[in-house]
Curated annotation (Swiss-Prot):
Coiled coil: none annotated. Pfam families: Glyoxalase. This is Catechol-2,3-dioxygenase. It is an enzyme of class 1 (oxidoreductase). Keywords: Aromatic hydrocarbons catabolism, Detoxification, Dioxygenase, Iron, Metal-binding, Oxidoreductase, Repeat. Fe cation binds at residues 213, 264. Residues 9-126, 169-285 form the VOC domain. It catalyses: catechol + O2 = (2Z,4E)-2-hydroxy-6-oxohexa-2,4-dienoate + H(+). GO terms for molecular function: catechol 2,3-dioxygenase activity; ferrous iron binding. PROSITE patterns: EXTRADIOL_DIOXYGENAS, VOC.
Amino acid sequence: MTSIHEDTHIGYAKLTIRSLERSLQFYCNVIGFQVLKKTDRQAELTADGKRVLLILEENPSAVVLPERSVTGLYHFAILLPDRKELGIALARLIEHGIAIGHGDHAVSEALYLSDPDGNGIEMYADRPRSTWQRDREGNYVMTTTAVDIEGLLEEAGDERKTSLPNDTIIGHIHLHVSDLKEAKAFYTDVLGFDIVGNYAGMSALFVSAGGYHHHIGLNIWAGRNAPPKPTNASGLDYYTVVLPHQEELDLVANRVKHAGYSIEETENSFRVKDPVSGAYITFVI
């Protein structure tokens, strides 16, 4: 198998929501994004004023489905540069009265919440890569224990911010899929991501580029053979994967076409439908 380039990373996610005004209040005031560009029905959000991290598109008639009922978004994950910034974000969430879940995953500390349309969000900070451990099979050792909430808040101290730091990125995307075997074939054999977590006991598979703990999480927690998200539902429409140069874009596109998947190409991007989550992936440089 040919691995995807080590400098590959997630770009942004595009979501359908029901009310742009309500969502902007949440994503800007609570999460800390800034509006980069806005029309009547769509907004592009950023942390640094330059790079798009999230696109919201309004569909007032969009249906909000019960959790874990279809394939598609489990959560998109906002990666903060350090533990202090995660603590500052936590304090902001608490001040706004947001319901928060949390998990210490050994490689990272994470907070979990949902937007007004039920789209899952993770806000997290990585621990130093030198501390990440792998088991005998090469899987990263990832746990789910309680985050030291008091310690996070102590890290933040009295510092409060209304916006995300400039070097915030989308660290990973986690998807409900219909079949893990097919997901493995598509994401590893076709796209070229490396398996970094084959967690059969928890019905999940984590893949990445360049040794990261995961750029894409895949699970069957909505049920094996779960149906795809209807087109009239809120949720993830597509996400982007950023490749370092045109040569890599051509290599990945050729692998996808050779495997029999249809793609939509432009001069410096292509789009393919993920057969197991129903979301589209746009590869860009």
